[in-house]
From Swiss-Prot:
It comes from Trypanosoma cruzi (strain CL Brener). One of its GO terms (molecular function) is fatty acid elongase activity. The lineage of its organism: Eukaryota, Discoba, Euglenozoa, Kinetoplastea, Metakinetoplastina. Its main location: endoplasmic reticulum. InterPro entries: ELO_fam (IPR002076). It comes from the Eukaryota. Involved in the synthesis of fatty acids. Elongates C10 fatty acids to C14. Required for the maintenance of the global lipidome profile in this parasite. This is Fatty acid elongase 2.
């Protein structure tokens, strides 16, 4: 289906990322500076009329951006997910997760999409720019998720972590749905699409549950492997630690967001006439 990726050289991509690892630091610091200073800059640009936030051009840009990311995730999903399921059927779940497979990771069509998935985490930072231009302040979960995924994905790909295939398959699937949802909301269907929001958050939470279980299992295998023995899982100790911390923090934050947004009852608005106050 994608003949142009048959000669994909993931090792070259890995070398490029390792040789330019400082760029990861610049991106992360620049992004955090954008989150910190961006709201004030946008307020000045907006003026009293919100000329930037209310711009029709901005709305169209948001629609196109989200549709592009949804399409990218869809094409990645339809390659990586079947490849991972085939690997499970051939090797079993545990060996599919923990076994080393250079050919699939760096040479196959699935490897191409895994590599592009990792590299896409840098342009995905533009999500935050669009949020700022709409006059919104990015919540902690938003920017924390973006910057940590960028760092973790970069490290995981360069470290050839075997569990990366599952992480990419899950994330591409969720992002295909999520970015399509954002595009439809920007098109003016927010009221219609709003009913699907809890289910998308539930999908994200499910992704974090699976990620937490897998990273915990891989960390257990890595730390219980005797000195000098073959690793029980093709994951480094550094990546195992990063994975556990990242996925468990996501699980907590997304669960908290779900509870606050959909599960906990909204506080009733106080009646101004209640204590004999005039209105």
């Amino acid at each position: 289906m994608f003949p142009y990726v048959e000669d994909y050289d993931g090792y070259a991509v890995k070398r490029l990322m390792l040789e330019n690892v400082d760029v990861l630091g610049y991106l992360s610091l620049g992004y955090l500076a954008l989150v910190w200073k961006g709201p004030a800059v946008v307020r000045r640009l907006n003026g009293e009329t919100n000329r930037v936030s209310n711009s029709g051009l901005l709305r169209y840009a948001i629609i196109v951006w989200n549709l592009l990311l949804s399409a990218f995730s869809f094409f990645g999903m339809i390659v990586v997910v079947p490849a991972f399921l085939t690997r499970i059927s051939q090797r079993g779940m545990l060996r599919a997760l923990c076994g080393n497979n250079d050919e699939m990771f760096y040479r196959s069509s699935a490897g191409f999409w895994i590599g592009m998935f990792v590299l896409s985490k840098a342009p995905e930072l533009v999500d935050t720019m669009f949020l700022l231009l709409q006059g919104k302040t990015p919540p902690f979960l938003h920017w924390y998720h973006h910057v940590t995924v960028l760092i973790f994905s970069w490290h995981t790909y360069c470290d050839h972590t075997s569990t990366m295939v599952l992480f990419a398959a899950m994330n591409l699937t969720v992002h295909f749905i999520m970015y399509f949802y954002f595009a439809m909301c920007a098109c003016g269907f927010k009221k219609t699409m709003r009913k699907f929001a809890p289910f998308i958050t539930m999908l994200q939470i499910l992704q974090m549950v699976v990620g937490s279980l897998v990273t915990t299992y891989s960390a257990y295998k890595v730390y219980t492997t005797p000195e000098g023995a073959a690793p029980g899982c093709h994951v480094s100790r550094a990546n195992a630690r990063m994975g556990v911390i990242m996925y468990m923090s996501y699980l907590y934050l997304f669960s908290e967001m779900f509870l606050n947004s959909y599960a906990r009852p909204k506080k009733p608005v106080a009646d101004p006439t209640a204590a004999g106050k005039k209105v």
